[in-house]
Amino acid sequence: MASPASTNPAHDHFETFVQAQLCQDVLSSFQGLCRALGVESGGGLSQYHKIKAQLNYWSAKSLWAKLDKRASQPVYQQGQACTNTKCLVVGAGPCGLRAAVELALLGARVVLVEKRIKFSRHNVLHLWPFTIHDLRALGAKKFYGRFCTGTLDHISIRQLQLLLLKVALLLGVEIHWGVKFTGLQPPPRKGSGWRAQLQPNPPAQLASYEFDVLISAAGGKFVPEGFTIREMRGKLAIGITANFVNGRTVEETQVPEISGVARIYNQKFFQSLLKATGIDLENIVYYKDETHYFVMTAKKQCLLRLGVLRQDLSETDQLLGKANVVPEALQRFARAAADFATHGKLGKLEFAQDARGRPDVAAFDFTSMMRAESSARVQEKHGARLLLGLVGDCLVEPFWPLGTGVARGFLAAFDAAWMVKRWAEGAGPLEVLAERESLYQLLSQTSPENMHRNVAQYGLDPATRYPNLNLRAVTPNQVQDLYDMMDKEHAQRKSDEPDSRKTTTGSAGTEELLHWCQEQTAGFPGVHVTDFSSSWADGLALCALVHHLQPGLLEPSELQGMGALEATTWALRVAEHELGITPVLSAQAVMAGSDPLGLIAYLSHFHSAFKNTSHSSGLVSQPSGTPSAILFLGKLQRSLQRTRAKVDEETPSTEEPPVSEPSMSPNTPELSEHQEAGAEELCELCGKHLYILERFCVDGHFFHRSCFCCHTCEATLWPGGYGQHPGDGHFYCLQHLPQEDQKEADNNGSLESQELPTPGDSNMQPDPSSPPVTRVSPVPSPSQPARRLIRLSSLERLRLSSLNIIPDSGAEPPPKPPRSCSDLARESLKSSFVGWGVPVQAPQVPEAIEKGDDEEEEEEEEEEEEEPLPPLEPELEQTLLTLAKNPGAMTKYPTWRRTLMRRAKEEEMKRFCKAQAIQRRLNEIEATMRELEAEGTKLELALRKESSSPEQQKKLWLDQLLRLIQKKNSLVTEEAELMITVQELDLEEKQRQLDHELRGYMNREETMKTEADLQSENQVLRKLLEVVNQRDALIQFQEERRLREMPA
């Protein structure tokens, strides 16, 4: 909106300041504003009050109202909370600027130094709901009229820094550009203060500036001395960012954004991408802001194959170094991926220019993420104390697919400012540090779902943001090492005592393990456990252990006619299928007594899973939480294999016999070979030796974890996410698992005909073969009626397609009454706008609608985010149901449509972030496993070598090996937990796809449907029923496990 003609130069300076798009323009226009008003810049909060008092300008009033509202919060004490505090903030990134704004509102004197002279990055940042409200409250719409006007909530990092820079200048923050912070200069004598070492040639006033608080926001590559950084490493992960020119044409406006497509649950998209372009990705995101911004994770082999990387180098820095990346090939790669993801609707993709005037496309490594061990420290010298705090990337490097950088960065900025407030109030150093570390413990766990829902109440006080806050979670005693009194020599702390005085916890020693096994097998006929070799050779001790933990599977009398190999094989198989304990050695090795280390490792898994379980007479024992996840996935995997084996013929399900099948164990004659070879276990794929921590068991066969990968794409196979082809015997990920029968594949479409274990499976009864899957209702029932063709009304189908099972519900209540038409309308509308990353759904809101930035619209948007949708009036219900079938008609209701689209996209983003968090954690687990395997191999070799090492040393090595085994078991069970969540995401995706497909049939007139259409519609309906029942089984399993794990 053009401002009226004004003769006051201050008004012109203000308008130029608000609209400035370059750092230098912002600074020069602000200096002109201050000169025109006769105000000295950088004068703290008093400067803001002077500007506001003298600039009586209608265009500024809305901005003053917002800043006054924020400053009037009681926590700031009218700008008097930190009036005697001097702060230095290093770094003018979003987090550093946000921290500076909070410190200024507290009344502190704030000086900020930044080594750059301009903001040049185009990257687009995802925003959580509270960050949107927070930025609006600081006047974001005034400075950037297009702020969060699309269906996805994001902003370019350049625009975010510009608007925060303008707020910081108005609030009196003193900013110095082109100044690099290189370190601290301690006070030389008593009475002096802390200063900064700055380059090059800082102004004399800045060089002599003494401060008592330092906030570092200089990025992950610069962390002040004294802080310890921990590396969180995963598998090699190569990210590619690309920014294309946004011409803001009508065609570009109508291309939907992609909030995230992840291979972990949407494999068909990536399979199509690979076939069409040869590009192999893990995920891709597309945001539309100042540029068309794409970010994706590419596979190294694909980059090598397409010539983006010249050669395969082991060091990541060299692999992605300038000399090894072909710029032209990288540009072709990014352009082709972006063009495919948007169906070519963006037209000619022209790269935006980076700060050096080159095409803005880059490959980067996010294999490792750095995280500071502590968030704050205190240094004291000559009586002068300095409080140091970290915010932004130097505190926690964000994982880009999760969109947590700005959100958690802002939270850390608030927490750091709260720490400064407590410091200014006179709280002791240890108390301040303990509170700050208590908050830091919460940071990595925060998400929009586990914070306070009312984002309007968020403020500097942590209690307004974090529910169930405990500021004493970390005690002052625990942070003494963060208080550095440089004048004194510290006595050795308890934490610095030699390792020999530390006690080991969390794993059983061999004596404790042997005693536990003796207790579990006591009273079983013919069993007397005295060691970890000969006592287990006949298989009876292992059967006794399984019998004690799972009564009813096999009575002692039934073992009389069973041979040692048969009994041992039975015990190993039942322990895996019914208790979730995967073997680490073969039945022959147990019989030969040749691998006591392997047996100790195997039995320690029993101990960790059942040591706290009480066994009452007749009571079926249950494994503790995480082993039950392994058990669930094992049943799911076997169910998938059985389903594929019964493609050509249906066979009635029967209980699996207690004797082993020939294919599940090696032949008996191999026993002598094992006896001679000692502890030899060989990988069945590569034929190389398997050490204990390397062993990965599938159906009684052992592999290296690194060897157990998809035969087609060589991707790592995780529990519940692979299948074995009965023809060639190879293992495949579900994406590349060959179809045995093409007709069946056509019937199933994109769905794998998996049958989830029903909740009854978790009661540890014998593992029967699953009954034939009925297409109408796969959930077993006491009396299954004859199958019949289901014909539902349109409304019944609409209700079915809108089902959404909530995984975190309590115990199952009685069936709910049918939902109101209002609920159905909202669900229908929401489904009509969901794109789930495949941009073929409803077009975006026209740009003309997005651009509205008047105050009434802004307030309306804020209300929409803060409050739930109001109940619909009865007369609107039928209208909205009709609109759900005709999304084009929603142009008549832009507010509803914008709100529903935004909320649908928010749900999509949550789903994508969840999938990416799982993927990242799985990669970290795999990397940690490799480290444990390498360490365990060294210990195992030392233990197996005939040497003159003292027994005490061997016992120490054995205890260390057991601790590594315990760590591995914990990682395996965590991996299983994650894969259950993957199954949940996969079923949600299948339900969404089927819902969309069914809605397409429903939207057609009944009279226009052919017989083939009717057949296909019923087929989709049957599949939808299957998926809904599978989700129900999964949720019931999770609920039963949750109830089982609750304290009595």
Swiss-Prot record:
Alphabetical list of InterPro entries matching this protein: bMERB_dom, CH_dom, CH_dom_sf, F-actin_Monoox_Mical, FAD-bd, FAD/NAD-bd_sf, Znf_LIM
Low complexity biased stretches: 654-666, 772-787
Gene Ontology, cellular component aspect: actin filament; ciliary basal body; cytoplasm; cytosol; endosome membrane; hippocampal mossy fiber expansion; intercellular bridge; midbody
Cofactor: FAD
Subcellular location: Cytoplasm; Cytoplasm, Cytoskeleton; Endosome membrane; Midbody
Coiled-coil residue spans: 847-867, 906-949, 974-1031
Domain bMERB: 905-1048
Binding site for Zn(2+) 1: C683, C686, H704, C707
Annotated ranges, domain Calponin-homology (CH): 507-611
Site (Important for interaction with ARHGAP26 AND ARHGAP10): K816
Region (Monooxygenase domain), start-end ranges: 1-489
Composition bias type Acidic residues, residue spans: 852-868
The protein's enzyme class: oxidoreductase
Positions with biased composition (Basic and acidic residues): 488-502
Domain LIM zinc-binding: 681-743
Chain intervals with Polar residues compositional bias: 747-765
Chief location bin: cytoplasm
Its EC number(s): 1.14.13.225, 1.6.3.1
A GO molecular function held by the record: NADPH oxidase H202-forming activity
Residues carrying Phosphothreonine: T475
PANTHER family recorded: [F-ACTIN]-MONOOXYGENASE MICAL1, CALPONIN HOMOLOGY DOMAIN-CONTAINING PROTEIN DDB_G0272472-RELATED
Family the UniProt entry places it in: Belongs to the Mical family.
Record text on subunit structure and interactions: Associates with the SH3 domain of NEDD9. Interacts with VIM and PLXNA3. Interacts with RAB1B, RAB8A, RAB10, RAB13 and RAB15 (in their GTP-bound forms); binding to RAB1B is of low affinity compared to other Rab proteins; at least in case of RAB8A and RAB10 can bind 2 molecules of the Rab proteins simultaneously. Interacts with STK38 and STK38L. Interacts with GRAF1/ARHGAP26, GRAF2/ARHGAP10, RAB8A, RAB8B and RAB10; may bind simultaneously to GRAFs and Rabs and connects GRAFs to Rabs. Does not interact with RAB1 and RAB11A.
The protein's name: [F-actin]-monooxygenase MICAL1
Source organism of this protein record: Mus musculus
